[in-house]
Each structure stands twice: as structure tokens, then as C-alpha cells.
Amino acid sequence: MNKFYLSAAVVAASLTLPALPAMAQANEIVIGITVTTTGPAAALGIPERNALEFVPKEIGGVPIKVITLDDGGDPTAATTNARRFVTESKADIIMGSSTTPPTVAVSTVANEAGIPHFGLAPFPITPERAKWSVAMPQPIPIMGKVLYEHMKANKVKTVGYIGYSDSYGDLWFNDFKKQGVPMGMTVATEERFARPDTSVAGQALKLVAANPDAILIGASGTAAALPQTTLRERGYKGLIYQTHGAASMDF
């Protein structure tokens, strides 16, 4: 289901929350959405912004006001946007962002303010965040288990990892160690790269030299293609696994 078709259901569900009687009786529902429409993750944020055209103008007779801001994938900018939603827009609901690091930042603000937050990217829902934050994408442990089971079925014993040098990369690497390693696989080598990087040649050479049975790429959006194309150019012939965060029209 498209995440923004789901957002209408999210708003409707929010109206039923006991903690939000004021919002249910309001003259309008204000939704602040911070997404990444510029920078390396724009391939994720632009479709999210465009999908807002399909958000209904009202639910249950209550008008909906949607305010959209760009954070460029920067946690600091996402924090600023979220605080604007709280202090200036008086938002009833906050959504965003498009990638994990700024989503964590938005969650922090939403939880401080006591405003429902719906993340559009996977992020760790710690006990202190669970009261106000929900991650809309499929949880990484669920998606990861399917990948690791496929690896096991294909006799993969050693796995090389290359992922973002941020919280999204950490989530996937830690999940592989938690679920994949107990299935009988070992980490051959771990490499990282930054989202804006235009080359991962050095990391690819190390991965090729390690010659693992498979390589897991913990990246999202257009930049997730960079390690895969580089690995093939450097002669890697093994299996390459992408995550569900890599899915985009540009990829």
C-alpha cells in the first residue's frame, strides 16, 4: 500500500486516540511533513511529496491542512522543520522524514512535544520513543529475515557488508549480526560510505579481495546503486542483496 494512501488511515486512526480529544474537536487537522526533496535522498522524498496530491482534503467533515518542508536529508534541518511544526504551525501530527537519520531527529522533537509522529523511513523505536512515534515502512528485522533465509537457502556462508555510515547502515549491519550470523553465516568484511559519496572504489576493492559468497548493501535510494555497479565493474561475481530502502524509480 502506498504510504500516503495509508496516511489518510493514519489521520483517521489518530482521531480515535484518547490522548487527542482536542484534535478530534478541532476546526482543522494540521499535518506537518518534512521530507527530503533535495540532496542524495531526493529520489525518495520527491515521490513522497508528489503523493501528497492524493491526500483527502477532509476526513469526517474535518478539513486537513498539510504543510510540507524540505530537510535535504539533514538531521539538523529536520529538527528545525519539526520544531517549526510544533511552535509555528501548531501541528496535530508530524510525518517524516525520508531517510533514517532525519527521521530519528524528528522523532525526538515529536516525543518532546507529545505529538504523534509517523516516520517514513525505518528507524529504531526505543521504549522512550514508542509512546508517540510509529515507523510506517516494514521493520528491518522482518525484511532482513527474508534476505538471510534466501542466503542460507543458496548456501551462502560468508557475507560482505557495505552500508551507509549512519544509523540506517548501523540498523542493517546490527540486524545481520543478530539474525544472519545465528543462521550459520559470518561477516567477511564490513565497509561504509557516506550518502553523498560519488565513489566507493576503495571499499569495493576490499570486498572483492575478501571474496565473500554474497554482499549485503545497507543503503537506500539512488545511492544504493553505487556499490552494486562498482562491485560488478571490479569483477565481483557473487550474489548481491539490496534492502527494501533501495526501491525507487531512479534506482
Where are these regions (language model features)?
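Structural recognition of the beta-strand scaffold that forms the well-ordered cores
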Residues: 30-34, 65-68, 92-97, 116-121, ...
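Bacterial N-terminal signal peptides that target proteins for export
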Residues: 1-9
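Extracellular/periplasmic Venus flytrap/periplasmic-binding protein
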Residues: 80, 124-126, 131-235
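Short N-terminal segments immediately surrounding and downstream of signal-peptide cleavage
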Residues: 24-40
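Beta-alpha junction/loop-to-helix N-cap segments that form part of ligand/metal-binding clefts
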Residues: 28-30, 43-50, 58-126, 193-200, ...
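Extracellular/periplasmic periplasmic-binding protein-like sensory domains
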Residues: 228-251
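Sec/Tat signal peptide C-region and signal peptidase I cleavage site
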Residues: 17-24
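Short helix-capping segments at alpha-helix termini
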Residues: 58-63, 112-115, 180-186, 232-238
